């Protein structure tokens, strides 16, 4: 299509049918056949390439106000905002497939905004239906890595006068850098056999929006020859032969080995002929450091679905050079669904038992990655208040095709303070203050039962070897959890009830970017010592973690038993920078964030206002408390960020707006991350 020599490296075919009901509204896609071959066969993390390509190069509907493409939103040339966003030119009147059409061309008012250039062929009658649409990206577009993009859509009028899409072809040329050989992605979609007959109600009762038939991967060559509307080229049809040939190239297996280790962060112990049954990793956790351990060495690994499709085993061993201690973790899990490689493949349905002895920071539970990741180990503050944890957890998780999941947990935990952290009973002369009468507590033990409900309709993700990663954050997410502490059961020392709820939603504003909103609230209903109170979601690393983590709250700085937080992140997609001379040539993009939290500590959990000896004194360093009770003023921090620097780097400056008078607090700071996006 581009008149260039193309070497196919991956091909994927899907045959499906889509059913739609207007009332009550329901739409489902039934995948009848799927066939893939190519470079992705060398990787063992599921259909990662196919999932990403499907999301990045999603279906285009020009009748929508905004077109979702490249994980961005583009203004449609016939959407409600088209008149103010595009310039239109009337070119000619001509015949398209024996129908008289008006030829229009369009270009964005600002070529660097997220929009198209192209042509519309509109039927010259009272319907003004689009007969054909051709859309391209402007040459000076602000989109990264895309050298060229062509979308061609054709529509036909059915005998009943309905207009339908019949052809939807997309060609995208990608390049990391100019002058370097790139990739070409071709997506050819043909629609046929439109029917408006009544559909069996049972089909709409099938679970999920995408239903995969059981034999979709086992279709014969005769089936594909019948349903394939565009024949494969000679190179495409001999893809398996090509893959076998490149495997024979001297040194190729070492290149693939290195690429897989770099991309997947794991080292496999098998080959293509003998698939890996055990993987070593994550690699980036092998050497780290912290205040208690000093330099820390760790070796981790997990079994794969090639060893057993249902049973999974994983764990690690670690050694700290400062405290001279060995640490370990092991997990055994049974998946009720047959898995291809990892435990968390969709839909999750498993029972797991894990036992861990390790050193932990109170903020580790909020990390989106492994706590021993060497990159997040670079902290902006000294984290010297930690704990030795012995944790035995039994987990059951069930996930449905509708986006609803339930997770039940039973846990027995022993928490022994380490480093500069000490647990002192609140039994001194003056409540909340330390003297020689206070009793030092060696450790605390809890027995817990927990239930988490989560609903994320339309969520899409890919499976890596470490975790599940969302492909898109467009889907809303609702979470509700409750944890009960049981005193007297298996040595549990406290009764408690902890409830938390959260909601996250992304809102798009066309060419003006997107707004991510996350709201969270929680309450600890019982009287408990401070290790069981609510802690703010603080990010102690220089690496930006997520939209809702507070970047300038120190370790255990605020202790609450009631809290509510709100995080707003507005990405303008370069709307401002694209209008500044010289700056717009850099293709930088701007982002603004503000995070706030209201919190309180009731008198029953405040050691300064209660003489209850079951409470603990607040954490101290050099005799001074390092944790505080929030007042009526909410904690607020704001940040201004620039991303897409060299198409790679995200940098933001964070400023603390309240509680700036606390001794030793950081009022501002710089955070960054590596971020490659279109």
Describe each PLM feature range.
Residues 449-455, 566, 667-678:
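Outer-membrane beta-barrel "beta-signal"
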Residues 134-138, 278-289, 299-300, 305, ...:
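Transmembrane beta-strand segments that form the barrel wall of outer-membrane beta-barrel proteins
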Residues 287, 350-368, 375-384, 439, ...:
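C-terminal outer-membrane beta-barrel translocator/porin domains of Gram-negative envelope proteins
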Residues 1-101, 107-116, 173, 177-281, ...:
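Structured extracytoplasmic
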Residues 433-445, 531-644:
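Outer membrane beta-barrel transmembrane domains
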Residues 268-278, 306-311, 337-349, 403-406, ...:
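Short loop/turn motifs that connect adjacent beta-strands in outer-membrane beta-barrel proteins
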Residues 315-319, 351-359, 408-414, 449, ...:
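Transmembrane beta-barrel strands of outer-membrane/channel proteins
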Residues 146, 180-181, 327-330, 363-370, ...:
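Outer-membrane beta-barrel translocator domains and adjoining extracellular loop/strand segments
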